[in-house]
């Protein structure tokens, strides 16, 4: 038994499922999860000392690579001054100014400690600002584990929310309406049936929680138009896409100005940080300037702010955005070429520093229904073959993968070599 397997067995005695976030348990791919001991650059090292080229990147934050010396030094320096004050600091101001400069739609912003806090707070703010209770999200899009966002209503239940998790009251869930991603007609139908009742649309500009699905042409423009017509707010959940798709986030990449934006992951440089912000007139509704209450003991934590500030300053250095996108495109194209070589149907998507691949013969994958038609069993086999070859992909067919600026040609070549071998095995097994 490996040390990872031993640790997993031990963890299950005191931690539900042995993990502190479900996807880490490898339920989506089978087998026992690897337990990580340390990480450096593009690599993670498990408890048995084996190295893996990492394309999970702590689920997105490690855009500069693991254990970056500048971020590490910033954290150490901040920690030496104190771990938490529960009072404002100058670093919070500098951080807010930097984010607002990089993402101009965020005229004002509030720091929180996670992406879930960011989306939860933005939803409350949208409801308070508009005086409306209902919200609209998209099937297959994930916005954190707040009750109002843990709703997945599809097919015949587009206008009546239903809990996708026990513990979400059915009556409460009815306030969350669910449309089909990349389908403006479904959005218009919901607004028509709920005239003057919808506070906001919340959307992942690139859907990264059903693998990686970019918007079809005109989708975000249509959402912006509908919100303007209906008096609803448009919220971009950029927890995953923020600073990864482009320096100015996905909203800059697609040239769309949302009313509110939610950030997480990259903004903390590996530390627990989230933020939400947007139009000044909307943000003024947040306490203490307005009636919508939001607070947090660790919001604006000085150590986390130091990490995030260092990360964003490094990230915005000239050429980094193009370098990251180029690396990711090379990898995504390589996967597709190798799949074609071995006669395995595969569809690959890539936007900036995130990518995803689907084992499918569909010509397009644009929504959750399309994703469910993909070959999950083949993905599981590919995942474990790649893991055996020292490549760590997202352990779920429904999650995006990420590159970092630390991934060099050596790692990319080794990854594609592993993919070539893995796909060859799958092709042979399919005969």
Curated annotation (Swiss-Prot):
Pathway listed: Porphyrin-containing compound metabolism; protoporphyrin-IX biosynthesis; 5-aminolevulinate from L-glutamyl-tRNA(Glu): step 2/2
PTM annotation (N6-(pyridoxal phosphate)lysine): residues: 265
Lineage, top ranks: Bacteria, Pseudomonadati, Pseudomonadota, Gammaproteobacteria, Vibrionales
HAMAP family xref list: HemL_aminotrans_3
Origin: domain of life: Bacteria
Organism: Vibrio atlanticus (strain LGP32) (Vibrio splendidus (strain Mel32))
Principal location class: cytoplasm
Gene: hemL
Protein's name according to its UniProt entry: Glutamate-1-semialdehyde 2,1-aminomutase
GO biological process: protoporphyrinogen IX biosynthetic process
Entry's localization field: Cytoplasm
């Amino acid at each position: 038994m490996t040390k990872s397997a031993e640790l997993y067995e031990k963890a299950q005695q005191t931690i539900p499922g042995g993990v502190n976030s479900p996807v880490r348990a490898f339920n989506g791919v089978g087998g026992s999860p690897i337990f990580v001991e340390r990480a450096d650059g593009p690599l993670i090292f498990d408890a048995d000392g084996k190295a893996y080229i990492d394309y999970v990147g702590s689920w997105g934050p490690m855009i500069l690579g693991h254990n970056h010396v500048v971020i590490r030094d910033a954290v150490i320096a901040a920690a030496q001054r104190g771990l938490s004050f529960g009072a404002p600091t100058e670093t919070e101001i500098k951080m807010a100014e930097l984010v607002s400069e990089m993402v101009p739609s965020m005229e004002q912003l509030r720091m929180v400690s996670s992406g879930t806090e960011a989306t939860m707070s933005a939803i409350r703010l949208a409801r308070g600002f508009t005086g409306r209770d209902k919200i609209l999200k998209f099937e297959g899009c994930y916005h954190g584990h707040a009750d109002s966002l843990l709703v997945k209503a599809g097919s015949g239940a587009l206008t009546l929310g239903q809990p996708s998790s026990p513990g979400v009251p059915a009556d409460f869930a009815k306030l969350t309406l669910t449309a089909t991603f990349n389908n403006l007609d479904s959005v218009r139908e919901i607004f028509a049936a709920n005239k003057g009742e919808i506070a906001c649309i919340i959307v992942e500009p690139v859907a990264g929680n059903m693998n990686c699905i970019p918007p079809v042409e005109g989708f975000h423009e249509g959402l912006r138009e509908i919100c303007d017509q209906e008096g609803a707010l448009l919220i971009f959940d950029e927890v995953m896409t923020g600073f990864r798709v482009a320096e100015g986030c996905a909203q800059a990449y697609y040239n769309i100005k949302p009313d509110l934006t939610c950030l997480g992951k990259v903004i903390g440089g590996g530390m627990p940080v989230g933020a939400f912000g947007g139009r000044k007139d909307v943000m003024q509704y947040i306490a203490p300037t307005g009636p919508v209450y939001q607070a947090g003991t660790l919001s604006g934590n000085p150590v986390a702010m130091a990490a995030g500030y260092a990360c964003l300053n490094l990230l915005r250095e000239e050429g980094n955005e193009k370098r990251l996108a180029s690396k990711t495109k090379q990898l995504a194209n390589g996967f597709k070429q190798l799949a074609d070589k071995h006669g395995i149907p595969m569809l690959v998507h890539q936007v900036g520093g995130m990518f995803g691949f689907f084992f499918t013969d569909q010509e397009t994958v644009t929504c959750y229904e399309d994703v469910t038609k993909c070959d999950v069993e083949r993905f599981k086999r590919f995942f474990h073959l790649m893991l055996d070859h020292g490549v760590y992909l997202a352990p779920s067919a429904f999650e995006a993968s990420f590159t970092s600026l630390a991934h060099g040609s050596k790692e990319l070549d080794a990854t594609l070599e592993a993919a070539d071998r893995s796909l060859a095995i799958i092709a042979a097994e399919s005969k």
